[in-house]
């Protein structure tokens, strides 16, 4: 039989009242914070991704697809100018 490390067992932790008091507050709080982060649009600003209505503008309705194998830099310049 191995020696004891002095740590509480997992079953002992999840059956304690203190565990559930703490986690009944923190788990819903994390869910609400994540929902607010996404629903307010802050996630778009933090990560720099375009919002759903910014993918296609009035002037640029096509997909920026590079088709030329030997002149991709020129096509990238054209796409950059259209922004």
UniProtKB/Swiss-Prot annotation:
A molecular function GO annotation: iron ion binding
Subunit details: Heterodimer of an alpha subunit and a beta subunit. PSII is composed of 1 copy each of membrane proteins PsbA, PsbB, PsbC, PsbD, PsbE, PsbF, PsbH, PsbI, PsbJ, PsbK, PsbL, PsbM, PsbT, PsbX, PsbY, PsbZ, Psb30/Ycf12, at least 3 peripheral proteins of the oxygen-evolving complex and a large number of cofactors. It forms dimeric complexes.
Pfam short name (any one): Cytochrom_B559
Function of the protein: This b-type cytochrome is tightly associated with the reaction center of photosystem II (PSII). PSII is a light-driven water:plastoquinone oxidoreductase that uses light energy to abstract electrons from H(2)O, generating O(2) and a proton gradient subsequently used for ATP formation. It consists of a core antenna complex that captures photons, and an electron transfer chain that converts photonic excitation into a charge separation.
InterPro entries: PSII_cyt_b559_asu, PSII_cyt_b559_asu_sf, PSII_cyt_b559_CS, PSII_cyt_b559_N, PSII_cytb559_asu_lum
Keyword Thylakoid: yes
NCBIfam families noted in UniProt: cyt_b559_alpha
Main subcellular location of this protein, as a coarse class: plastid
GO CC annotation terms, alphabetical: chloroplast thylakoid membrane; photosystem II reaction center
Identification of the protein by name: Cytochrome b559 subunit alpha
Sequence similarity: Belongs to the PsbE/PsbF family.
Organism: Glycine max
Superkingdom, natural source: Eukaryota
Co-factor requirement: heme b
Lineage: Eukaryota, Viridiplantae, Streptophyta, Embryophyta, Tracheophyta
Annotated cofactor note: With its partner (PsbF) binds heme. PSII binds additional chlorophylls, carotenoids and specific lipids.
Transmembrane segments annotated in the record for this chain: 21-35
Gene, per the UniProt record: psbE
Matches recorded under HAMAP family: PSII_PsbE
